Amino acid sequence: VGFKAGVKDYKLTYYTPDYETKDTDILAAFRVTPQPGVPPEEAGAAVAAESSTGTWTTVWTDGLTSLDRYKGRCYHIEPVAGEENQYIAYVAYPLDLFEEGSVTNMFTSIVGNVFGFKALRALRLEDLRIPPAYSKTFQGPPHGIQVERDKLNKYGRPLLGCTIKPKLGLSAKNYGRAVYECLRGGLDFTKDDENVNSQPFMRWRDRFVFCAEAIYKAQAETGEIKGHYLNATAGTCEEMIKRAVFARELGVPIVMHDYLTGGFTANTSLAHYCRDNGLLLHIHRAMHAVIDRQKNHGMHFRVLAKALRLSGGDHVHAGTVVGKLEGEREITLGFVDLLRDDYVEKDRSRGIYFTQDWVSLPGVLPVASGGIHVWHMPALTEIFGDDSVLQFGGGTLGHPWGNAPGAVANRVALEACVQARNEGRDLAREGNEIIREASKWSPELAAACEVWKEIKFEFEAMDTL
């Protein structure tokens, strides 16, 4: 017979500790929890096999191809400190296994069937190294950080946003009114909530029209460029593009997409449309916690963030470190840097398993959003720096005097923090003092400080990994 039938251990073919990784390989770091009795080498090799060329038994057609050329390889395994029976398995994939310019195809292989594999109790993809040879096949973000600043004519500070609440139930007219008040007060952007699409109480076209009116009115009054993230997410790709086309016809600067619920194929199409038509693209990460919240299973958000930079988006939500949603400081800053820098060194203390060279792919602005208010402003300015979007939903609309004064309070707090930082003051230590000083000459800020003063913010405590 031409080949040897039967079942053999994965590790005989797919565990190759001597392998030297190539510059063109896609590298993955998996956190593997094997079932009792399964050795880690076998588990790591099984992951490499099932996410590349392998199947459960030797097949006749293996002889018609070159496994050595196409197989994934588990090239290193290390135990996870402090965890029983958990290992980091490093897997290298040859570039030819992936379709060019398709995040969808990359994920279908790397995080496809293998996650349901019986020999594993749990599996988590912690990080991916995307080689320039692959990232160069993607358009990436429609515009990137610098082009966005030029389009908006806003420099030297973080941008300010606000999600319009209540997220569901407002009519289009009242929704537009809320947008106008926030923009007039000094915000750069307002935002559709991620689940505002086109519901019976407010159809998308009506919302787009009233929000555009609000933008133009606020621009005329303030002399600043304003935007509202018009959510183009829809039930079909065709409908999504139709909404983006209408936004372009209205002349607004930015649209929005829920990239995980909408899917990577839809997102990449929208990103291409946005670059071709001069629209900025704001990305919301609804559903990410379903994938990334469990420590031992799923995918870390840094992988979803890298995937978004490939697929395309100019802003993406990235946790706050300080608000109501989860996000540890060093780890968050790790993937924030992966979003906006060209070159990020391997640094295990920040959860970065591989050095990532993005070459010239545009960067993405991280968005801090969720339970933040004026007392957080010094910390946010310090942690995220200038290249970020700070979004205060309740922290704007919850102001006792209304939306516009709420917006004023946030803008004054931000400008005060930026000025203090530029004068060399330590925002971590003097943050509360800086806000108090500014509130002496801004009654709007003083009122905001009073409302949220009980919600204490301890800056030092967040500094642990």
From Swiss-Prot:
<keyword id="KW-0150">Chloroplast</keyword>
<feature type="binding site">
    <location>
        <position position="193"/>
    </location>
    <ligand>
        <name>Mg(2+)</name>
    </ligand>
</feature>
<feature type="binding site">
    <location>
        <position position="285"/>
    </location>
    <ligand>
        <name>substrate</name>
    </ligand>
</feature>
<dbReference type="GO" id="GO:0000287">
    <property type="term" value="F:magnesium ion binding"/>
</dbReference>
<keyword id="KW-0503">Monooxygenase</keyword>
<dbReference type="GO" id="GO:0016984">
    <property type="term" value="F:ribulose-bisphosphate carboxylase activity"/>
</dbReference>
<keyword id="KW-1015">Disulfide bond</keyword>
<dbReference type="InterPro" id="IPR020888">
    <property type="entry name" value="RuBisCO_lsuI"/>
</dbReference>
<keyword id="KW-0488">Methylation</keyword>
<dbReference type="InterPro" id="IPR036376">
    <property type="entry name" value="RuBisCO_lsu_C_sf"/>
</dbReference>
<dbReference type="GO" id="GO:0009507">
    <property type="term" value="C:chloroplast"/>
</dbReference>
<feature type="binding site">
    <location>
        <position position="194"/>
    </location>
    <ligand>
        <name>Mg(2+)</name>
    </ligand>
</feature>
<feature type="binding site" description="via carbamate group">
    <location>
        <position position="191"/>
    </location>
    <ligand>
        <name>Mg(2+)</name>
    </ligand>
</feature>
<comment type="subunit">
    <text>Heterohexadecamer of 8 large chains and 8 small chains; disulfide-linked. The disulfide link is formed within the large subunit homodimers.</text>
</comment>
<feature type="active site" description="Proton acceptor">
    <location>
        <position position="165"/>
    </location>
</feature>
<keyword id="KW-0113">Calvin cycle</keyword>
<feature type="site" description="Transition state stabilizer">
    <location>
        <position position="324"/>
    </location>
</feature>
<dbReference type="InterPro" id="IPR036422">
    <property type="entry name" value="RuBisCO_lsu_N_sf"/>
</dbReference>
<dbReference type="GO" id="GO:0009853">
    <property type="term" value="P:photorespiration"/>
</dbReference>
<protein>
    <recommendedName>
        <fullName>Ribulose bisphosphate carboxylase large chain</fullName>
        <ecNumber>4.1.1.39</ecNumber>
    </recommendedName>
</protein>
<dbReference type="InterPro" id="IPR000685">
    <property type="entry name" value="RuBisCO_lsu_C"/>
</dbReference>
<feature type="binding site">
    <location>
        <position position="369"/>
    </location>
    <ligand>
        <name>substrate</name>
    </ligand>
</feature>
<keyword id="KW-0456">Lyase</keyword>
<keyword id="KW-0460">Magnesium</keyword>
<feature type="binding site">
    <location>
        <position position="163"/>
    </location>
    <ligand>
        <name>substrate</name>
    </ligand>
</feature>
<keyword id="KW-0479">Metal-binding</keyword>
<feature type="modified residue" description="N6,N6,N6-trimethyllysine">
    <location>
        <position position="4"/>
    </location>
</feature>
<keyword id="KW-0601">Photorespiration</keyword>
<comment type="similarity">
    <text>Belongs to the RuBisCO large chain family. Type I subfamily.</text>
</comment>
<feature type="binding site">
    <location>
        <position position="317"/>
    </location>
    <ligand>
        <name>substrate</name>
    </ligand>
</feature>
<keyword id="KW-0120">Carbon dioxide fixation</keyword>
<comment type="function">
    <text>RuBisCO catalyzes two reactions: the carboxylation of D-ribulose 1,5-bisphosphate, the primary event in carbon dioxide fixation, as well as the oxidative fragmentation of the pentose substrate in the photorespiration process. Both reactions occur simultaneously and in competition at the same active site.</text>
</comment>
<dbReference type="InterPro" id="IPR017443">
    <property type="entry name" value="RuBisCO_lsu_fd_N"/>
</dbReference>
<dbReference type="Pfam" id="PF00016">
    <property type="entry name" value="RuBisCO_large"/>
</dbReference>
<keyword id="KW-0934">Plastid</keyword>
<feature type="binding site">
    <location>
        <position position="167"/>
    </location>
    <ligand>
        <name>substrate</name>
    </ligand>
</feature>
<dbReference type="GO" id="GO:0019253">
    <property type="term" value="P:reductive pentose-phosphate cycle"/>
</dbReference>
<dbReference type="GO" id="GO:0004497">
    <property type="term" value="F:monooxygenase activity"/>
</dbReference>
<dbReference type="Pfam" id="PF02788">
    <property type="entry name" value="RuBisCO_large_N"/>
</dbReference>
<dbReference type="InterPro" id="IPR020878">
    <property type="entry name" value="RuBisCo_large_chain_AS"/>
</dbReference>
<feature type="modified residue" description="N6-carboxylysine">
    <location>
        <position position="191"/>
    </location>
</feature>
<feature type="binding site" description="in homodimeric partner">
    <location>
        <position position="113"/>
    </location>
    <ligand>
        <name>substrate</name>
    </ligand>
</feature>
